[in-house]
Each structure stands twice: as structure tokens, then as C-alpha cells.
Swiss-Prot record:
Belongs to the methylthiotransferase family. CDKAL1 subfamily. This is Probable threonylcarbamoyladenosine tRNA methylthiotransferase. Residues 368-424 form the TRAM domain. The keyword Methyltransferase does not apply.
């Protein structure tokens, strides 16, 4: 496939970004040329399908590309391929498909698309996504998928139909890849999975051992640990708290609770209680006082009553996370909760607006506590509108006028918003 020009566009999570980097690496190794969309012979859209708004963005983007570039080959990759093939067939029946477990077959799909043929490469494999060719989107940040899939049974989720049951990758390969990334100049290692704390449930290994192993690599760099399900954290709470104490690990805990009501959590089949979430947060904060907490909330689950919603508001007021990700509940393909009646849309909108206001107040209050303080930041990239973007030791984003990507700087925080800090 020497000389085939390929453009890759990515939607969704950090894991999807890693998938795109792997596809780019595999394609370049086979002789493809990575380029912008206008110059491409083949366009790859790596889809996300976890939320209803993202589904619409993905579908509209596929349609727009087909209208704008009818002469180019199209490969649709990512979660949509496995979750909703009937809808994909309806909107893009002439496109080739590449499932998220089939990244090494990207050259096969691209060759077909470049020749006007349709190739459908789907289904699960046992392919390992570490120590494979990569093209980093940011040369300073290396994303390592440590495991793929989920053994959970959340009633609202469709992602597991795309990613399958959990497959943990060998710890020695993960640590070796991190070592090579640091040696090549990376300043940030991101560990990603659908649930990083579930790492090793199938192999007997633990996430805490991975973190400790990477922390022992010589060099000045940071480790960001991705989202962890509370039920998975409980299996190794002591080890994780200890691992997070390393100065190389961002003091940042992404712990989705989804609801502040135990009855709703039970209906969601989350496998944990509100008190267990509280206990995990309190344990981390007691031993790592500067840790920032991120959590996710689903607003308007079908069985969420007004009292349940107020319990969620109360929990956020109590815990005061630094990052709060809100999603309005909408049915997802193949999810069990799709058999339930959705709540009235006007009520859903009211609850969502109320939570959005609460979120902005809490996150701005938390960020304003840092105004006037001095923080060491890792500058990770140039800002789109000028300046530079860095991260504090607690992973809070900082916008600064001066800097050099890859450098560590001590800055004074002069102002704050609900989403970032401003430094001198």
C-alpha cells in the first residue's frame, strides 16, 4: 500500500485515541502516508457510541464526509461498528468497517477502500495493544491501553458490546513500553482502559503493581491513571492508595459514581453503594490531601425520582469534586435499561440544568481555592488560542502565557474558572 494517503479522525475517549495512534502506526509501517483530510485517498473515522449526543455527532460527521468527499474511500472504525451495525449500514453502506479489536487489519480495510471495494472486518480477537507500532498525536504524551473490555453489567451501557470481556495485557510489556516512551522524550504516561482498576481480574495481577513499576522508571515524568470503577477499586484499595503516593503519579482520581442514590445505583446494576464511593474518596483524601476527584453523573435514569436526584445533588455538595462530567440519560442500543420508559424530557432538562449550575459552582469554588498559590506544572501543549496549557500535580489544567511544551515550571495562579486556572 505504498503511497496511499490516509487521514484519521477520532471521536471519544483516551482509549479511542490510543486506537487511532495504533492504526496510524500500523498503516505507516505498511507504507501509508498520514495526511490531512483534503489530501487523503482514504478517510478513517474512529467512532465513539457511548452517549446519545456523540452518536449524533458521529452520524452527522460520516454523512458530511460522504457528501464533501464522495471520491475518497471511507473506513468507519471504532465502537459503532460493533454496537449498531444496522444503523451504520443504513447511513454508510458503501464504507468499509474496522472493529475496535481489529486494528492490525487496518491496512486491509484501507486497501479495499482505496480500490472502491467494501471490506467488513469485525469481531473480537485476543490481539494485545501494547508494544505495537504507534504514531503519537502529542509527542510528549504516551497512552498505554493496559486492558480492554469490562466484566461489569451496568444496565445503561452499550460499550461492553464493542469491547467485550476484559483482557488484561502483560505487565512486563506495559512497563517496558512506558520505559521506551520516557526514553524517547515523553513527559506524561497515560494508563487507559474502560476500567483501569479492573486490570488483572483475569490474570491475577493488579493495577497498583503497574503504577509502582512505571513509577520506578528513571526520569522526570508524570503518570495519569484513567477511570476506575468503585467496585474494582475496592479489590486493591490499600495498594492503589500507596501507589498514588509516588511523586510521579498525578494526584488525580477519576471515580464515576453515576448517582447519589443507592436505589438508582442498584437499578443501574453498578455493583457499589454511595457509602463505598464516599469511603474510597475519604481514604484517598486522608492519605493524599491534595488529590483532585473527578466523577461522572447520569441525570434522569428512568427510575430516578425527585428524591434520588436531590440525593445526587447532596453527594456532590458533600464530596465537592474538582471535575464533574454530566450526561443526560438516553437509551443506548442493546442496553437493558432501554426497556424502561424514559422520564419526561422537560423534567430531564430541568434536572440537567440544575446539576450543570451546581457543577460550575462547585468546580469554580474548588479552583478558586488555588488562586494566589504557587504550583509546579508540566506544560503539555500549546493552546489553540495562544499561550500554553499545563497540568498541576493534581491534574488541574493551567493556562499560562509563557512556557515550553515538555518543561516543568513553577507558576503563580492569578485567577480561576470552573474548568481551568490562569497563571502569571
Amino acid at each position: 500500500m505504498d503511497g496511499i494517503r490516509v487521514y484519521i479522525e477520532t471521536f471519544g475517549c483516551t482509549f479511542n485515541q490510543a486506537d487511532s495512534e495504533i492504526m496510524a502506526g500500523v498503516l505507516r509501517e505498511e507504507g501509508a502516508v498520514l495526511t490531512g483530510i483534503d489530501d487523503a485517498d482514504v478517510i478513517i473515522i474512529n467512532t465513539c457510541y457511548v452517549k446519545h449526543p456523540t452518536e449524533h455527532k458521529v452520524i452527522n460527521r460520516i454523512k458530511k464526509i460522504q457528501e464533501t468527499y464522495p471520491e475518497k474511500g471511507l473506513v468507519v472504525a471504532g465502537c459503532m461498528v460493533e454496537i449498531d451495525p444496522s444503523k451504520l449500514e443504513a447511513i454508510s453502506g458503501d464504507a468499509s468497517w474496522l472493529g475496535p479489536h481489529q486494528l492490525r487489519r487496518a491496512p486491509q480495510a484501507v486497501r479495499a477502500a482505496s480500490n472502491g471495494l467494501v471490506e467488513r472486518i469485525t469481531g473480537f480477537t485476543s490481539d494485545v495493544k501494547v508494544k505495537v507500532p504507534r504514531v503519537r498525536s502529542n509527542p510528549l504524551i504516551h497512552i498505554i491501553p493496559i486492558c480492554e473490555g469490562c466484566n461489569g453489567s451496568c444496565s445503561y451501557c452499550c460499550t461492553r458490546f464493542a469491547r467485550g470481556r476484559i483482557q488484561s495485557y502483560p505487565s512486563d510489556l506495559i512497563i517496558s513500553e512506558a520505559r521506551e516512551a520516557v526514553a524517547s522524550g515523553c513527559r506524561e504516561i497515560q494508563l487507559t482502559a474502560q476500567d483501569t482498576a479492573a486490570y488483572g481480574v483475569d490474570t491475577g495481577e493488579k493495577l497498583s503493581d503497574i503504577i509502582k513499576g512505571i513509577s520506578g522508571i528513571p526520569g522526570n515524568f508524570r503518570i495519569r491513571v484513567g477511570m476506575m470503577h468503585p467496585a474494582s477499586v475496592l479489590r486493591d484499595l490499600d495498594g492503589l492508595v500507596e501507589a498514588f503516593k509516588s511523586e510521579k503519579v498525578y494526584s488525580f482520581l477519576h471515580l464515576p459514581v453515576q448517582s447519589g442514590s443507592d436505589s438508582v445505583l442498584a437499578d443501574m446494576e453498578r455493583g457499589h453503594t454511595v457509602d463505598e464511593f464516599r469511603m474510597i474518596v475519604e481514604r484517598f483524601r486522608s492519605e493524599i490531601p491534595d488529590i483532585s476527584i473527578a466523577t461522572d453523573i447520569i441525570v434522569g435514569y428512568p427510575t430516578e425520582e425527585r428524591e434520588d436526584f436531590m440525593d445526587t445533588c447532596s453527594l456532590l455538595e458533600e464530596v465537592k469534586p474538582s471535575f464533574i462530567h454530566l450526561s443526560k440519560y438516553r437509551h443506548r442500543p442493546r442496553a437493558r435499561s432501554s426497556s424502561l420508559d424514559e422520564i419526561d424530557f422537560r423534567e430531564l432538562r430541568r434536572r440537567s440544568r440544575a446539576l450543570e449550575e451546581l457543577k460550575m459552582r462547585i468546580t469554580e469554588e474548588e479552583n478558586r481555592r488555588l488562586v494566589g498559590s504557587f504550583q509546579e506544572i508540566l506544560v503539555v501543549e500549546r493552546g489553540r488560542k495562544g499561550g500554553f496549557i499545563g497540568r498541576t500535580g493534581s491534574y488541574i489544567p493551567v493556562v499560562t502565557e509563557t512556557g515550553e511544551p515538555g518543561s516543568f515550571r513553577r507558576v503563580r495562579i492569578r485567577d480561576a474558572t470552573g474548568t481551568y486556572l490562569l497563571a502569571d
